[in-house]
């Protein structure tokens, strides 16, 4: 018999990246932002707020895909490279 677990997760900015609402903003180019979406339903994944990653299940393997959506944060974007980093912490529930 397998135990049933769910997974909670927390998405956080790392290094010089910050957030504006549910958008990750690179420290080296604040004119762009990145929103993370669940691929299955295109819902926004919140930053700095725990969310349910996997519902309680007896499945031994679960795959969750995400999308990163780039958006302009200003009407006068700065062209060029940028670096943004986020980490995801996962918790058994």
Residue ranges and their predicted role:
Residues 1-93:
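Mature extracellular/passenger domains of Gram-negative fimbrial/pilin and adhesin proteins
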């Amino acid at each position: 018999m397998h135990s049933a677990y769910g997974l909670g997760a927390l998405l956080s900015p790392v290094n010089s990246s910050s957030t504006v609402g549910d958008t990750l903003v690179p420290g080296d180019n604040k004119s762009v932002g990145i929103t993370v979406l669940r691929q299955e339903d295109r819902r926004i994944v919140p930053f700095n707020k725990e969310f349910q990653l996997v519902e309680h299940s007896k499945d031994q393997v679960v795959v969750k895909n995400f999308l990163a959506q780039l958006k302009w944060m200003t009407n006068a974007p700065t062209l060029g490279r940028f670096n943004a980093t986020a980490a995801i912490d996962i918790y058994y529930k």
